[in-house]
């Protein structure tokens, strides 16, 4: 239908009514007006998009007539050429040329290269405009202003901040002057609103809700286009990009995974309520509703409907997020002497907002920062909160930790001003926070417990409190009695980061994945929270005999029980969602109705089914640990499920969420008002039937537009003049009588107010549920323990696993033990060769030699892993095992330099060894693999010999020492009661080709590895055999074999000389001297004696 015609069929075409002027004003506004403002029923930005489309479609033909009906105020801002269409066609190319000339002025030789590149791109963008364009002159003026604004904005970006425009722009924003003098263009109200929010959150990428989509502006748009692979274009004064609202969670997660802090800005008012408000002529009000980083991904914006909507592909946006720790590090330098050495006191606080877990620690660390590295390796944080100034060794460690990760796994680093870490400021922050948060009867004790923490911990805690307040997540810190100390020497075995890495306890060293690690072998859990707890068990083996045996008793109970009760409980666990994360999301009041319903319904079903199993549990479960866990699980959550309307909760309809509104009087009142309006509209239907003389007339609803009266076009003449035409087709027309118009407007206002009221009541409902948070968390922790026990029981069922015997004595006795990971990886087709171990006070050191690739490193790792599994509370891969409690495990394995620390391979070895010497105790297990390599043979032997002797004589720990230096084995003669020499068994095979070729062609011996630990010394390492297996060229092998034979002959000769002259020195008679000479002649070495 031509635009010139009236919506009512032409009856009002004589003059533009108020409604018509409202429509026209959308298309023709002054340069300083709000282009994105809308009618009373549409979001502003939605109209903006429509305007641009309608303008481009309506500038030709029929709409030229319409353009002359613009009000005078609007016409004053339009170019004079608009009154002379013919002249305007001639002027438009000139305007384009002027814009290009203006653009060339900015591309001066003094401009930066990147400025020139950007301006050239803008010139190309402008040249695309046709020479005889159909755009209005006002549109061309805005295009020219946008080009100039983009150029000035790029210069301002390079001059100052990486976000948004230059400081001058922010100054103008604060002064409420929507005019950019540098670019001579006008900021729209939406842009001013964005600038104001951007000034408050300069370090965040902002997603701004605009109707049915979220928009990015400025550099945020360029970041989004680059990282999300979406389209970015120039609009007014900023580059802009957009995403649909229903895909927000996908794109927010992707940006967060890249390391960005992302803010979500939402509209805080609706069209109907805005129409009756005081600011109905201004832009929609918006505010920042959520901030997200890698550690704070909590909220319904980023959590899709897991297990309620099968169409959502979770793998599309997230990987394994089992641990999302935020780790805050603070270091307190000591006196000048310690400062020179690099020693200092370090405090760390780690929080996992997704689960509510809080850990802390305070420790003394050396210049190597090994203790801090251990905490980072154990927690594997995704985000670090650091002071702006740290010591050089710590900065190098942080750089190394963040650079090790790849792609989206990179650790995000957040810096905070040093002032917030100062003790006086931190103490005030902590006391104010807990004085406000703690109001229970035990509040004073909790507050005193926090204040009595070490100073570095308080400083780190204050920074965490301040940081989490940005995300409204500080509530998780309100229960300091639930804080856990990360490394307690009285509770957990000491395992540093080097040991975690060398033993591949959490991830393998090949591709840094879980497969091939100890955690992978033990993990048969059915729940996410159980998997997280098992990881803590693996990295923190127990020290208390009673707790270890309690776990072993529970595993044994599950393993040997013939009842089906355990299988039924395991099936219940398999059905559970991630209740721990869900409860934490509820506690922070960031969950959706779907998530709340899923969590509460799952807990209610679990409770009822466990209640039915309680008789069988009491009669068949012998373990006190399991019985206590299951009984304490029961928690009253049925009340909250009964209140909810399931179908409404699943679709997120908060207006119909509550069944009984007696506890929600505000919602009840609002619904009554809505019903009254609907009732009055229905009552008027009889009157409309009489007017139209249609007894069967009914309201119709089309495309969401309600209460329309539909009349055939042939009967339109009977419609009263004051009725408003809403829409039409070829057959019918639809109208709203004046009463319906007013009532429908009131109805929409009440409905939108109902939504706001329901949101407020929903938050209050979550607050009420949050009172049970800590009780329910305790129940979930018990469930996680049950899941871990079931997982360890599955490991024990694999075959040839035994229950270890734990003792307080210092001993490790293993009969036919196997390496847990290699045993599983080889499978049944390749049989792993078992080996036994016997370490105790009678023989606490094993010196292990043998050929390369003979299995020495695998053997010492096997002994260590079996010990760790025993103290976790797991069955172990052996026929028998008796393990004395080990307070710490220290390893020095491998050979690699450290470029970040500027250390060579040999320096790295000695640094780790020095740290072990300082930390190890008589109750520790020490593993040293080929210490001394990387330098000359004499220096290597000397260091290896002296270090091992120190451990034997002074440290007195259980030690496994692997070496290729035969002189080290002589320590067995010096300490026969403490040291034993062993080697990995092998067979030397004579090569037939070698025999055929004769002595002229030397080839290395062929060695068959037996992989069996055997008492005694291996005189040779048979390295040439490894070269042969590696397909080293034959001529190289021949030369190497010949040289090896020659060197062995020289060494043997020197040894014989030494023995010969030792015997001569011990000779006391002529007879003995003749005997020595005869022996010398017999051995035929006279000619080799020195002259």
Swiss-Prot record:
Pfam assignment, any one: MutS_V
Coiled-coil regions listed: none
Keywords from the named record: ATP-binding, DNA damage, DNA repair, DNA-binding, Nucleotide-binding, Phosphoprotein
Region (Disordered): 1-84
Transmembrane segments: none
A single Gene Ontology CC term: MutSbeta complex
Subunit organization: Component of the DNA mismatch repair (MMR) complex composed at least of MSH2, MSH3, MSH6, PMS1 and MLH1. Heterodimer consisting of MSH2-MSH3 (MutS beta). Forms a ternary complex with MutL alpha (MLH1-PMS1). Interacts with EXO1. Interacts with MCM9.
Described function: Component of the post-replicative DNA mismatch repair system (MMR). Heterodimerizes with MSH2 to form MutS beta which binds to DNA mismatches thereby initiating DNA repair. When bound, the MutS beta heterodimer bends the DNA helix and shields approximately 20 base pairs. MutS beta recognizes large insertion-deletion loops (IDL) up to 13 nucleotides long. After mismatch binding, forms a ternary complex with the MutL alpha heterodimer, which is thought to be responsible for directing the downstream MMR events, including strand discrimination, excision, and resynthesis.
Name recorded for this polypeptide: DNA mismatch repair protein Msh3
The species this protein was found in: Mus musculus (Mouse)
Lineage: Eukaryota, Metazoa, Chordata, Craniata, Vertebrata
